[in-house]
């Protein structure tokens, strides 16, 4: 399971449509992770997507990141795994499409 510990509390990290939609609503722009601010905001959205009843605010998250930078390292490792997983699915879908085209 993908989790991050913030202030001695464990939160589930979820990369999902919900997380992307939360990001777009909060950032008031289309989903893209171009800046450090985007990354921090998406980390928060991944936490919200996995922990609907959390009382963690974005401001509290930023304070925690200042105190414990390893939180962001956990997030970047999580993102690497998620992007790798998505690339695998994309590769399988493309290969499947090529095989179907041969029929």
Summary of predicted features, one role per range:
Residues 40-41:
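Extended, low-complexity alpha-biased scaffolding regions
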